[in-house]
Amino acid sequence: MQTESETSIAQNARPLATQPLGRLMRRYAVPCMTSLVVAALYNMVDQVFIANAPDLGSVGNAATTVVFPLTVAALAIAVMLGDGCCAFVSLMLGAGKQEDAHRAVGGTVTVSVVAGLVLMTAYLLFPDTLLTWFGGRVNAGTFEKAQEYFFWIALGVPLYVFGQAMNPVIRSDGSPTFAMVATLAGAAANLVLDPLLIFVCHFGMAGAAIATVAGQALTAGLSIWYLTRMKQIHLQKDSFRPRAHLLGKCAKLGMTSFLAQISLVAAMAATNTMLRICSAQDAVFSQEEFSAIPMAVFGIVMKVFQIVISCAIGLAAGCIPVAGYNMGAGRHDRVKGLLTRLLAAEAVVGLIALLVVELLPDQVMLLFGAQNESIHYTLFARRCFRVYLSMIVLACINKGTFIFLQSLGKAAASTLLSMAREIVFGVGLVLLLPQFFQLDGVIYSMPAADVLTAILSAVVLVRTYRSLETEK
């Protein structure tokens, strides 16, 4: 027999099984998408102000490109914990298992704090080695600025991991809007502090990093405040004791998110390395004054890509509570309808992005101080945008497919697709193609990887539709 508390929780969750799918997507996916886009803007905001600082410019942006993969590594841990917990909790709420839900959330809180502290320690102990691995030795100026920036970013890692892990947990509690507000508040703080610390206080790279960490601290603080006022999940002191069997299930569901991010780290390491090697062999970029341009431009292109792909991830991740609840409740017809709507939305996002990067690359680069750089900077950036992101529609659909499969509990298929994209195709092609096409090989590696991944995704999607039809 259900207690009064369990009955209240069930009533709060019931709209997931009854409300129109379009309305649920708007309620959950739009705030989630906004949160992730704003999170992606953290580093991009830094690059905009750094690019326009007279003493930083392209060298400063090259430095942030070196540090960026190490930020993504922290994000990988956060999304594994947060997305996995979100998917697990949604399934448990759909099945009416409230105890497992609150224990999973509490355990995730504890582990995210510990993981952030461990990663911060590693970053502070081995900064030079890590920066060298990710291409920091492209020239002396880039390495020096990367060291300055990375020190402060490393100090903020525990805050970043905790805040990003709690965001999907808050969504799973039925509060996607608060999750969005927590991220927006942090981004707003970063946006205000960046120009103040860089241009007024003249703190340079350190100022950009401190502004980022301050924003992360605000997001983490708001997340802590929400945990004391959850709606569907009632945390107790005992909830925060990690339970291996529950955390293992969460980790399994979040493994796709983790591998997607950590394999992106591997891909960025390979890309940065090949950029450094190929630039040294290029007639223009082998010159000292232009040597930082390829690294700086690729960093900007990747930040723009991160914003677009954050939209794609947000659309899919926002559907996790809806898909998970209906899957747990046996409503496979609604799951199938949600998948169709998601794929269509992903295609629209990708198409809009494609039009921007193909038609307006120069205008985008103006945000990043192109007017202060050489013609080589502008020409290389234009080519990178138009070629490197030419298959961004497929990239969005691929990413939506990976995450939606995760919400259905199909962790193996989701993980294999994600690994194929980032490691087999992503890393493989960025190492292979430059052997034949030099710097152009790096540029063509991403669209080629997206096309090959789309073929695999199509096969898995057909099978998923058939299984949902059979189980209806």
State the predicted function of each range.
Residues 37-41, 116-120, 124, 161, ...:
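Hydrophobic positions within alpha-helical transmembrane segments of bacterial inner-membrane proteins
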Residues 44-48, 121, 165-169, 188-196, ...:
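Alpha-helical transmembrane segments of multipass membrane proteins
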